[in-house]
Amino acid sequence: MSSLLTVIAAPRRLEILRLVWDRERCAGEIHEAMPEVSFGAVSQHLRVLSTAGLVAQRAEGRFRYYLARKEDLGSLREWLETMWGDALARLKTRAEL
């Protein structure tokens, strides 16, 4: 879990995940949406996300297309919901005192 959190801790990678959440995009489209980031940096972030299993990639000609692998984020979601639920339970207990 900690390695997954390390991967998504980078703001640029979170932005890339947001961009590929609902539709497939090629690396060039992702770079166009983030003009302040070099194409090389976008490629490196995509490689990290892909290695972590957070994005799927497919090649079509000379282009690579990326899409978020939402099903692989399930364990992270469950962990965050548990943490959030525990925090809310503690807050409720304190409020009732």
Model-inferred region functions:
Residues 2-38, 63-74:
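N-terminal helix-turn-helix DNA-binding core of bacterial DNA-binding proteins
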Residues 41:
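Residues in the helix-turn-helix
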Residues 50-61, 67:
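Beta-hairpin "wing" of winged helix-turn-helix
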